[in-house]
């Protein structure tokens, strides 16, 4: 039986698995994927979405922290992180506190969406609902650790402040 906060979703067609890639600074979900299998391609798709959103070759200095799941410690996944110039960081085995932000996001996802709208019939229904939830989460969900504002606002505030500092320095 899946652990309660892990993003597994029961549907009439069987179990689905959900992967999120989260920007820790602003708590923004920058990549996600729903899959009927736990293969490496599943988490690679979420990673590719995040890499496209964040363009690490432009910004540099990115660190990817994850649990010790077989998908994220696979050779292909590690190679892709390296190609993108992203530093891998892997947590302790069985330590939910080591990846507390991911556990929190997974729990919110299940409480605010999955359990509230169950039962789920199809993968497509879960994908569409997840797309809508991620957009709502990033743009409207107030989060205490970032000052009771949504992740998109926290990120916009950071870049606005950065632009001011650059203008002052020029």
Which functions belong to the PLM regions below?
Residues 1-170:
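Charged DNA-binding/catalytic regions of mobile-element recombinases
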């Amino acid at each position: 039986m899946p652990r309660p906060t892990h993003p597994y979703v029961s549907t009439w067609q069987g179990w689905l698995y959900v992967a999120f890639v989260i920007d820790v600074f602003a708590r923004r979900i920058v990549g996600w994927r729903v899959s009927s299998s736990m293969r490496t391609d599943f988490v690679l798709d979420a990673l590719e979405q995040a890499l496209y959103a964040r363009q690490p070759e432009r910004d540099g200095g990115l660190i990817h922290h994850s649990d010790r799941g077989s998908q994220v410690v696979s050779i292909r996944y590690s190679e892709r992180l390296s190609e993108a110039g992203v530093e891998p960081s892997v947590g302790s085995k069985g330590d939910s506190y080591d990846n507390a932000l991911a556990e929190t996001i997974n729990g919110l996802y299940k409480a605010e969406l999955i359990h509230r709208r169950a039962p789920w019939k199809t993968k497509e229904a879960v994908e569409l609902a997840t797309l809508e939830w991620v957009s709502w989460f990033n743009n409207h969900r107030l989060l205490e650790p970032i000052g009771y504002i949504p992740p998109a606002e926290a990120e916009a505030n950071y870049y606005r402040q950065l632009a001011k500092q650059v203008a002052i320095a020029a």
